[in-house]
Amino acid sequence: MRKPIFSLSLAAMAMALAPSVAMAHAKVMSSTPAANATVSSAKAKSINLVFNEKLLAPTVKTDLLMTGMPGMKDHTPMKVAFGSMMGKDGKSVMLMPKKALTAGTYKVTWAAAGSDTHRMNGEFSFTVK
């Protein structure tokens, strides 16, 4: 009776410790500007997101909002017009604002799925001075 329990325990531990591609989810590994960074308008001509895996292009959705403006208390978030494109590597997305970003706080939201097809989402903010 001990042998089957030991074998099952060993198999369960091996499965738990083994890396699994199926359990991976798309997530942002880095961004430019970085989350919570303060940058000049010149350095905010594009926003780049780099993910941990190739994305399924039809699942990618991004948004860019201005959430704060100097001197304006309780600023209502405003959508910022932008174009976007996926990198040739399939792991990166570039947002290109149609107009230069003015001083203020911005929020990038994203949703995407990788090979496991689980749609993940996230957001980060940065400030333009």
Question: Predicted segment positions?
Answer:
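Bacterial N-terminal signal peptides
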Residues: 9-18
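N-terminal edge beta-strand
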Residues: 24-43
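Short glycine- and Lys/Arg-enriched binding-loop motifs that mark or flank ligand-binding interfaces
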Residues: 20, 32, 118
